[in-house]
A protein has these predicted regions:
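Short coil/turn linker motifs that delimit alpha-helical repeat modules in TPR/alpha-solenoid proteins
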Residues: 59-62, 95, 134
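Ankyrin-repeat helical core positions
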Residues: 32-36, 72-76, 91, 107
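Membrane-interface junctions
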Residues: 92-93, 131
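Short linear regulatory motifs enriched in tryptophan with gly/pro/ser
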Residues: 2-26, 38-45, 55-56, 75, ...
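Extended HEAT/HEAT-like alpha-solenoid repeat tracts in very large eukaryotic scaffold/adaptor proteins
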Residues: 23-31, 38, 63-69
């Protein structure tokens, strides 16, 4: 769901199914029309829409996304520093969902316009990447640093992460895998296949926020065309995983095998030996082929 792509490239937007005459649906359509105007006079309106859209409201995520994307479109088409400043201000909001989208679209305000990131902005983004308490804003900040060619923070250096991997169609079965901070999502993917005694013969993706098909958080197999970033590029300790975080592993898009992954421990020291390794298991591996 990306209104900025619709406005810039006329990409269709899939909206949640509902009755087209419902007030929330009509409000969403109206916001999309207003956003496409890229009117600098609407900057205060978009700022207020972002902060006033509450999580329990219908279409709250869509409305919040439209507000952040509309500010970005104004920054791109009108070269508005006020729109940029508004997005930067929203990156400090108390709500993580607002911070996440503000950081994501702030990055796009520069990349879509082909503008370099100012050093002052990169300094602020680095602080968010290191210290934000929520995963999504921290990860989005790290994506900006990566795009800008800046070094990424390495959390828990020389330590390990424990990932509990559970097939979503067989929740009584799991494998807990320990992997070093310096290893990659591709290392984790290969070992998941090994741990469940499955062939590794299909494409796959990780969705770091646990939402299937959310391209902002997707890392894919390197055999896929035009779908970077790749899993082999994603170093575990640079992603920004907090304890208790959940992500999604999608293997074999036709068979649609889904695995929930939970960060169950982040340990600063490792035992000698090879990693990844299984440290806990329960249940018989489910069949790969029906």
């Amino acid at each position: 769901y990306d209104p900025l792509d619709k406005w810039l490239w006329n990409t269709p937007i899939p909206l949640p199914p509902t009755t087209p005459t419902a007030p929330a649906w009509q409000d969403t359509q109206h916001l999309l029309e207003l956003g496409n105007l890229a009117d600098p006079q609407l900057i205060p309106f978009w700022r207020e829409t972002a902060v006033a859209t509450l999580p329990h409201n219908s279409y709250h995520y869509e409305h919040l996304t439209i507000a952040a994307a509309a500010l970005t479109l104004i920054a791109i088409r009108r070269q508005s520093e006020i729109a940029i400043h508004t997005l930067r201000h929203l990156t400090n909001n108390s709500r993580p969902d607002i911070r996440e989208l503000a950081i994501h679209y702030l990055g796009r305000a520069y990349t879509e316009a082909g503008r370099p990131f100012p050093h002052t902005l990169l300094n602020d983004i680095t602080l968010i990447a290191q210290h934000d308490t929520a995963f999504e804003p921290r990860y989005q900040a790290r994506r900006i640093l990566q795009i800008a060619g800046e070094p990424l923070p390495l959390d828990n250096p020389n330590g390990v992460y424990d990932f509990k991997v559970t097939p979503m169609h067989s929740r009584r079965t799991y494998r807990t895998i320990a992997i070093r901070s310096e290893q990659t999502l591709r290392d984790l993917q290969r070992f998941i296949q090994h741990a469940f005694e499955w062939d590794n013969d299909h494409l796959y993706s990780f969705y770091l926020n646990g939402r299937k098909y959310d391209g902002r958080y997707r890392f894919s197999s390197s055999y896929e065309e035009n779908r970077p970033p790749w899993a082999y590029e994603a170093i575990i300790g640079q992603i920004g995983f907090p304890l208790g975080h959940h992500l999604l592993y999608h293997f074999d898009y036709t068979a649609d095998h889904l695995f929930e992954i939970e960060v169950t421990a982040i340990r600063p020291q490792i035992r000698a030996g090879n990693y990844p390794r299984i440290i806990a298991d329960h249940g018989k591996p489910p069949a790969q082929y029906a």
